Curated annotation (Swiss-Prot):
Keyword Ribonucleoprotein: yes
Family matches, as SUPFAM superfamilies: Translational machinery components
Name of the protein: Small ribosomal subunit protein uS11
Family according to the record: Belongs to the universal ribosomal protein uS11 family.
GO cellular component terms, A-Z: ribonucleoprotein complex; ribosome
Domain of life per record: Bacteria
PROSITE patterns attached to this UniProt entry: RIBOSOMAL_S11
Molecular function, one GO term: rRNA binding
Subunit structure: Part of the 30S ribosomal subunit. Interacts with proteins S7 and S18. Binds to IF-3.
């Protein structure tokens, strides 16, 4: 016989965050948009591939725009108004993702390029022959 236990389910209250950091990782194959609070705790994220784009369409500026819009929808539940944008990588979705976040109603405080640049560290991979 199954015993019915009285589980108390309470609705989880989302914390209110006004300032956030948008991390945009734009590679040649995909674009990942993550929005976190000032401490680095992730509030929401979206990718071009997760937004329904596959193959070579994942790496387009339009796919990055859609990913940024989806991430903005997720994060607006937290009450985020101001964003610092950190862009990493050489991909084609860099600029369009920033524009999409601006169009979503966020006040962009600053845009910082955090692409890792070696100070002559590891030897790079061989040139592609296509």
């Amino acid at each position: 016989m199954i015993k019915s236990s009285s589980l108390r389910l309470r609705k989880r209250i989302k914390k209110q965050v006004t300032d956030g950091i948008a991390h945009i990782h734009a590679s040649f194959n995909n674009t990942i948009v993550t929005i976190s609070d000032r401490q680095g705790n992730t509030l929401g994220w979206a990718t071009s591939g997760g937004s329904g784009f596959r193959g070579s369409r994942k790496s387009t500026p339009f796919a990055a725009q859609i990913a940024a819009e989806r991430c903005a929808e997720i994060v607006q539940e937290y009450g985020v108004k101001n964003l610092e944008v950190m862009v990493k990588g050489p991909g084609p979705g860099r600029e369009s993702a920033v524009r999409a976040l601006n169009a979503a109603g966020f006040h962009i405080i600053s845009i910082i390029d955090v692409t890792p640049i070696p100070h002559n560290g590891c030897r790079p991979a061989k040139k592609r022959r296509v």
